[in-house]
From Swiss-Prot:
The gene is gatA. Allows the formation of correctly charged Gln-tRNA(Gln) through the transamidation of misacylated Glu-tRNA(Gln) in organisms which lack glutaminyl-tRNA synthetase. The reaction takes place in the presence of glutamine and ATP through an activated gamma-phospho-Glu-tRNA(Gln). The lineage of its organism: Bacteria, Bacillati, Bacillota, Bacilli, Lactobacillales. It comes from Lactococcus lactis subsp. cremoris (strain SK11). It catalyses: L-glutamyl-tRNA(Gln) + L-glutamine + ATP + H2O = L-glutaminyl-tRNA(Gln) + L-glutamate + ADP + phosphate + H(+). This is Glutamyl-tRNA(Gln) amidotransferase subunit A. GO terms for molecular function: ATP binding; glutaminyl-tRNA synthase (glutamine-hydrolyzing) activity.
């Protein structure tokens, strides 16, 4: 029997009332994964034996009635370090690496009774927006297996949208949670920068990376954010701010809420069908009592250029540690030390990772630093100021999550610029360190369209309040791909 249509609150009730055991639920989840995996390739590793052992231990001690996540399975993106479980970031260079420690979020999952059931596929080192850059295998879109699932958290989105798991963790550097959530018709949140510890997250761009939850519904998303948030002394960028109950405003009226609609988010490059769905969603929020007004974020058009300079520069620095000596892939038949470095990195990193390392190295070079990296930092400040100005008058910003719905597998592989532009609307949120969510808001040619809601720093509750109000009065989140029922 499959339980994939039940929320974690409903599953919790079944577990507390002993209508099902954690072991039975875990076995059902493993069956769901086995049935769907051949079509979507969301998982890189399923930790069946470990998961069953943990479930049996939970049954032995008894379900905690006060912890809604106790005994529930979760999938974890493969750039989040898990002790004793191979963690590769979907890269050949980390093949076979078994971490001796847990990421802080992995410990928090265990402390909340969540069972890590496997590691999820992704674009290599989280570099990519389609899911095609995994060095192992590409994940497929659950609505149409000829389409991309989005990236880089491709497996995190596909595993939830297909009904393999109810919950997953991803990471978001320029849209890597929100974009695949949009493409697969689920809920994905990038929390405020510093809200969730990055200790144990394999670094891509340290000033932009953030771990976040992907779920079928808004409430489950907030429940998972409750688990993973909080200050961590092991992460110097972790914020020591109080952590609220993120579900506290769910169900509250949104009458009088002021929502900004940036004109730049509906301009050139935005598909007409996507635009139509998002403007209809804005009208729907007006009917619920929100005040929606057009604003301008004038520097957002520079976001993609700024991002690819800053992110690539940080990546070129972060990825220096993969040298073929300390851990990971080591080339054979080498002549000297330099040859070891060159061959190990050339053979171990995929083409997109190499492209970004070269771009970053160029941006940081003596002749380009002022012209590129320094200038990008200055424009980043202008983007931050644009958001701050809008948030003086408005509670939230609304727009499409992506300019288009999912495209064909392989269609943009040889055109990196068109691939990069897919993150046009999500990147500014990372540059400003703000929280942003994608929720299902319609369909374009049978493929899901996501609506993005952007909030003030540390105000995820208001995002969840408005997202839940929209979800409760629409049925987009209830629509499921054919694969879900298999």
């Amino acid at each position: 029997m499959s339980y994939n249509n039940k929320s974690i609150k409903e599953l919790h009730e079944l577990l507390v009332n002993k209508e099902i055991s954690a072991l039975e639920l875990t076995k059902a989840t493993l069956s769901d994964i086995q049935a769907r995996e051949p079509q979507i390739d969301a998982f890189l590793k399923v930790t069946e034996e470990k998961a069953l052992k943990e479930a049996a231990a939970i049954d032995a001690r008894g379900i905690n009635p006060d912890v809604v996540t106790d005994g529930i399975s979760i999938g974890v993106k493969d750039n989040i370090v898990t002790e004793g479980i191979e963690t590769t970031a979907a890269s050949k260079i980390l093949g076979g690496w078994i971490p001796p420690y847990n990421a802080t979020v992995a410990n928090k999952l265990s402390q909340s009774g969540l069972i890590t059931i496997g590691k999820l596929n992704m674009d290599e080192f989280a570099m990519g927006g389609s899911g095609e850059n995994s060095s192992i295998k590409p994940t497929k879109n659950v609505w149409d297996q000829t389409k991309v699932p989005g990236g880089s958290s491709s497996g995190s989105a596909a595993s939830v949208a297909s009904g393999e798991v109810r919950l997953s963790l991803g990471s978001d550097t320029g849209g890597s949670i929100r974009q695949p959530a949009a493409f697969n018709g689920i809920v994905g949140l990038k929390p405020t920068y510093g809200r969730v510890s990055r200790f144990g997250l394999i670094a891509f761009a340290s000033s932009l990376d953030q771990i976040g939850p992907l779920t079928p519904t808004v409430e489950e998303n907030a429940q998972l954010l409750n688990v993973i948030s909080g200050f961590d002394k092991n992460d110097s960028t972790s914020s020591n701010v109080s952590v609220p109950d993120f579900t506290s405003k769910i169900g509250q009226d949104i009458k009088g809420m002021k929502i900004a609609l940036p004109k730049e988010y509906f301009g050139e490059g935005i598909d007409e069908k996507v635009k139509e769905q998002i403007l209809a969603a804005a009208k729907h929020l007006e009917k619920l009592g929100a005040i929606v007004e057009e604003v301008s974020l004038p520097h957002s058009k520079y976001g993609v250029a700024v991002y690819y300079i800053i992110a690539s520069s940080e990546a070129s620095s972060n990825l220096q540690r993969f040298d073929g000596i300390r851990y990971g892939y080591r080339a054979q038949d080498i002549k000297n030390l330099e040859d070891l470095y060159v061959k190990s990195r050339s053979e171990g990193f995929g083409p997109e990772v190499q492209r970004r390392i070269m771009l970053g190295t160029f941006s940081l070079s003596a002749g380009s630093y002022d012209k590129h990296f320094k200038k990008a930092g200055q424009v980043r400040t202008l983007i931050i100021n644009d958001f701050a100005k809008v948030f003086e008058k408005y509670d939230l910003i609304l727009g499409p999550t992506t300019p288009t719905a999912a495209w064909d597998l392989g269609a943009r592989v040889d055109d990196p610029i068109s691939m990069y532009l897919a993150d046009l609307l999500t990147i500014p949120v990372n540059l400003a360190g703000l929280p942003g969510i994608s929720i299902p808001a319609g369909f374009a040619d049978g493929l899901p369209v996501g609506m993005q809601l952007i909030g003030k720093r540390y105000d995820e509750e208001t995002i969840y309040q408005v997202a839940a109000a929209f979800e409760a009065t629409t049925d987009f989140h209830k629509k499921q791909p054919i694969i879900f029922g298999k």
